[in-house]
Design a protein with these regions (language model features):
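Divalent-metal-activated hydrolytic enzyme cores
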Residues: 1-18, 37-53, 61-70, 80-136
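Short Gly/aromatic-enriched secondary-structure transition segments
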Residues: 19-26
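A generic structural signal for alpha->beta connector loops
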Residues: 27-30, 118-120
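A short beta-strand-loop structural module common to alpha/beta enzyme folds
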Residues: 29-39
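Short, ordered loop/turn segments at secondary-structure junctions
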Residues: 76-78
């Protein structure tokens, strides 16, 4: 069984940092991983409805096959998908950027809990230096 399903962004700048973060948590080979541009935003947006379907199908398989206990949602700062989909650059105002990511991370958490109330959901925001903060 896997402990969790991780949703992260496709940004090439952070792939190694994501792996290092998960390894640092002692989760090497303990999680399934789905990658969508924009992470939480990608799973929710109407910009590409196929991404919504893909996320939910992956979550179902992770739950049914690997009996995951939690979903880890990891957005990151200076996300190009947020710029493209929302047509705004929030990276210049860190507080606003945190609020915007927080909104989509919360919205996805609520949607997950509606379908899978038994799953724990973590909401994280990665900085470009690879450090991670929890988002409330």
């Amino acid at each position: 069984t896997a402990e969790a399903l991780l949703l992260s962004c496709m940004d090439y700048r952070l792939i190694d940092d994501i792996t290092r973060y998960m390894d640092g948590r002692g989760m090497t080979n303990q999680y399934d991983h789905i990658v969508l541009a924009g992470a939480a935003l990608g799973a929710l947006t109407d910009y590409c409805k196929e991404w919504n379907k893909t996320f939910w199908e992956h979550l179902k398989i992770a739950s049914d096959l690997h009996h995951i206990k939690k979903v880890i949602l990891m957005d990151h700062r200076d996300c190009g998908a947020y710029k493209v989909i929302l047509k705004a650059d929030f990276s210049k105002d860190q507080q606003m950027e945190t609020r915007i990511h927080g909104k989509f991370l919360r919205d996805l958490m609520v949607a997950i809990h509606k379908r899978y109330p038994e799953l724990e959901v973590e909401r994280l925001l990665m900085n470009l230096d690879g450090t991670v903060q929890k988002v409330s």
